[in-house]
Amino acid sequence: MGAGPYRLLDTRYGIDAPAKRVGAGGTLAVKVAGIGGIPLGATSVLVNLTGTGPTATTHLTAFGAGSLPGVMNLNLATGETRTVLAVIPLDSNGYIHIHNANGSVNVIADLEGSFG
């Protein structure tokens, strides 16, 4: 488990994504392998995932490849800020994907380490 801490994403300020909120049904693809000390061969990462200021009750789901899984990582009520530590698999190109269900929300992802 190397690397970290490193800010991978912050939609409030345009870090690795446009400086705008993630809309309902929106999914961000975030490059991780080779970033912030993560080796290109990493298979998963430990990420501190934060949602802040949602306009509706929502949930964030972080995942690797394939279709959206049926589980969520972080539940948020309107206007609140919450954080969760999650192990997220990387897709074959070294990305993680973060999906917002409802309303719009700012998303922050801080890398804490990697596996594999």
Please report, for each region that a protein language model flagged, where it lies by residue.
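Short edge beta-strands and adjacent beta->alpha junctions
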Residues: 1-116
